[in-house]
Structure formats: C-alpha cells, structure tokens
C-alpha cells in the first residue's frame, strides 16, 4: 500500500524542465503537461501530447489547447478534433486517458484563439477547400457560432482562414484572417464593426493590453508559420494609428503579461523576449538542445487561479529536441514584470 501511494505521488509531482531552457535568476520552471504513447516513432518514444500551437486559460485556471494537425498542409489535408481542457494542476496524458481531457465538439482545424470574460473560450476554425471560416465561443463544452460560418448563397464568406482572436476592454473582438490579409473588428455580439480594421500580409496572432492597444503578428512572405519569414509585429493604439514595432523572423506566439508587457516566442531563434512599447527587445529565455518554444500564454490573476497557485505564471508549449509531433507544456514562475521594469 505504501509503495503504491509513493508511486502515485511520484507520478503526480511536477517534473523539472532540466537544462533545455535558460532563465533569469529568480525564475523556476517545471513540466506542467506531458504525455506518453503519442510519438509514432516507437524507437524514439518522445514524451508529450499531440502537437499543439495554441494555448489559453479561463478564469478558473483551466488550460485549453488545440492540436496543430495539418492546418497548413494544403490539398485535402484537414483535421477534425475537439480541443483539450487541462484542469488546474496539469496532467500526464496517454492514449488511454486522452478522452477525459477532450472538450467540446469536434471542429475543423480548430485553434484556441483567446478567452472572453474569463469564461468563454474563443475558437477559430476553417474549411480549406470551401474557403469558409468561423469564430466560436465555447462555454461548458458547448460551441456557439459568434461570427462567420457558411454565408447565404451569393454572399462572400466573412472569414476564409481565421487564426487569432482577442478582446479589448470595451468588449470588441478582433480576428485575424490569414487568407484575406486583414484583421476584422467585431462587436461583442459578433456583428462586423470594421471588416478591414488592419490590412497586413498573412496576419496570424493577436493580443490586447490594458492600455487599449492591439498587437498583431503577421507572417509576411512565409506561406506557413514554420518558415523563416521575415514577419512583423504591428501595434495599433487606441486612436487606430498603427505602427510596425518589430521586424524579424516569423514569431510563434505572443502574449501579454498581467503587468501589460508583450512576451514573444521566436521558434527560429529559440528564444522568448519582451517587446517594449518603442520596439526594444528585452531577452527573457533561451532554449538549448534543439528545443524551441511553440506557443505561450499567461494564467490570469483571479481568486481561483490564486488558490490554484498558477496566477500570473507563464506557460510555454515546448518542442523538445526537434520532435514536432509531440509537445510539452512548461510552467514558469517568477517576478516577470519586476524583471522588465529593471531593464
């Protein structure tokens, strides 16, 4: 009995992330979500869950992930999957236990795009052949169409390939459409406010901050986000004025910390940096041993996340040792905003 209990405690204990990530003094990291049995190369047997490139939290501290699948594969390649919901505390997933973490209905090429009011998960989907995309809001596992979808006959689709989504303090919803080279602005009910809020080549990622600014990362000439680019990050201020604040390799993910700082994951340079208001880069983390960041997001600060012990922590989807087919989620804790203010 004692041996079984000890084995269970060891199984549930967080794993150290080893030396594949280099962090500033005062920060710690652990593996938060991992898995076994998903690597198709039985000889390699890499740990991790099926590849995922989008991540978001609700106000309770539950983590949502979506499979990357063959979203950029072209041709007839597409995927129909539910998203994952990981309860506070993390998880170790296997093919036998995967079902308990699946959340909501199967959707076509889903991406966890963001959250709203701490309760609703915004999910984008698209059908490559029909060139029709949709934005869903998901609550309690039920998906409800918010905008887009199949239009009336003779009417062009609002979205063709929606990717990121974000909500500002006034409740407006912003959606990137990578195929149509625009960012669309919606009201809280999904009605179109501005179909061309921003015109930019292959926009993919979105974030908003408490200053009323909208941040958009685009892929530029890269046909797929795993290509080098170059890409760029545009900041739109509350007056609607846009400015390019960063040019470089295509970034994998962006996310705003609870203190309002924009963190950027650069897969090609294998690092995470902070982008200041004037476009200055502040180094935060670097990866070794052929590891790289694939996505990132911060847990919100709420009474529930504080009780769960994850409030304000940074979570990173990691590609380990160049193995794209499976990924792990790392949790990083530390004084993020104090570090940036000190730089």
Spans of model-derived segments:
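Short loop/turn segments that connect beta-strands within beta-propeller blades
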Residues: 86-91, 138-142, 186-191, 236-241, ...
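Beta-rich, blade/repeat-based domains predominating
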Residues: 38-60, 102-120, 152-170, 200-213, ...
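A short loop-to-beta-strand structural motif that recurs across blades of beta-propeller domains
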Residues: 74-75, 79-85, 133-136, 181-185, ...
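Residue position within the beta-strands of beta-propeller blades
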Residues: 64-66, 121-124, 174-176, 215-217, ...
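Blade-level signature of beta-propeller repeat domains, shared across WD40, Kelch, NHL, RCC1
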Residues: 293-343
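A short beta-strand motif characteristic of beta-propeller blades
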Residues: 30-46, 92-103, 143-156, 191-197, ...
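Short loop/turn segments immediately following the C-termini of beta-strands
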Residues: 68-70, 125-128, 178-179, 219-221, ...
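Blade/loop signatures of beta-propeller domains
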Residues: 17-30
């Amino acid at each position: 009995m004692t041996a079984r209990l000890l084995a269970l405690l060891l199984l549930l204990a967080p794993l150290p992330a080893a030396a594949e990530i280099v962090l500033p003094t005062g920060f710690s990291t652990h593996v938060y979500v991992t898995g076994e049995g998903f690597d198709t190369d039985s000889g390699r047997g890499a740990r991790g869950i099926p590849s995922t490139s989008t991540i978001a939290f609700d106000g309770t501290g539950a983590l949502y992930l979506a499979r990357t699948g063959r979203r950029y594969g072209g041709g007839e390649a597409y995927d129909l999957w539910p998203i994952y919901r990981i309860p506070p505390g993390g998880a170790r997933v296997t093919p036998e236990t995967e079902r308990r973490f699946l959340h909501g209905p199967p959707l076509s090429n889903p991406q966890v795009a963001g959250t709203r009011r701490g309760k609703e998960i915004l999910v984008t989907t698209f059908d490559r052949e029909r060139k029709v995309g949709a934005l869903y809001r998901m609550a309690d596992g039920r998906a409800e169409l918010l905008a887009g979808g199949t239009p009336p006959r003779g009417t062009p689709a609002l979205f063709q390939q929606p990717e990121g989504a974000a909500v500002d303090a006034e409740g407006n919803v912003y959606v990137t459409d990578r195929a149509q080279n625009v960012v669309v602005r919606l009201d809280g009910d999904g009605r179109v406010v501005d179909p061309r809020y921003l015109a930019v080549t292959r926009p993919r990622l979105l974030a908003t901050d408490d200053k009323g600014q909208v941040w958009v990362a685009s892929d530029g000439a890269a046909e797929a986000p795993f290509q080098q680019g170059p890409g760029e990050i545009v900041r739109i201020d509350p007056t609607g004025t846009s400015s390019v604040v960063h040019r470089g390799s295509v970034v994998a993910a962006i996310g705003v910390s609870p203190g309002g700082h924009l963190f950027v994951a650069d897969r090609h340079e294998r690092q995470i940096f902070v982008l200041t208001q004037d476009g200055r880069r502040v180094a935060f983390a670097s990866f070794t041993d052929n590891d790289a960041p694939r996505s990132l997001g911060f847990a919100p600060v709420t009474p529930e996340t504080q009780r769960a012990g994850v409030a304000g922590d940074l979570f990173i989807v990691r590609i380990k040792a160049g193995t794209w087919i499976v990924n792990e989620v790392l949790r990083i804790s530390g004084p993020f905003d104090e570090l940036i203010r000190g730089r």
